[in-house]
């Protein structure tokens, strides 16, 4: 086994602590947070209790668990009705937890009404051209002293300065995050052996839904919307935890 294979095997082991690959109620492949991921979000938060918490792209609501005893109101938002049905079943005995179906951009919450926002394995699915609008919305409803806690797939290094690492990460993510049938039929046969793929090539040749965002891009958009990244906890070069506050 070569160095690259050893490294990628370690990535898989590290990710398994935080991410579960499951089949959603509507039959889709989905990635859900583990209890350890949820606990890590709570540990990262400056708020150990509060009034209102919002989970963006909540899925089955697993990331909410450690926060439920400590917040007066918790709201989970997701596009999938099937995911929300599962989440509602899990939290049916918790009167302070409710769920809404819809896009993050369409949230109908009062200005500066949320203490903490959390999001796990969701925001990377938003195309960059839509990300600024999402950030504007979040900035409006987050309290001035509030925070956004994020656990997600994100290129945490500068991909243009470390092409060999990006190539390894890119190949790994394509193989492990795209639907298996899509990867085997439309991606794997066209990957060139010995070629070092660059971030620019990824942007040029990969459909938007399969592209990977870099932290340096996201930081720029966050800053434009009035946010700043206060803390980064790296798990792998492409997955970690971010604490984001208003600038």
Predicted regions and their residues:
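A short glycine-rich, Lys/Arg-flanked "PGG" loop and its adjoining helix->strand segment in the class I
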Residues: 132-144
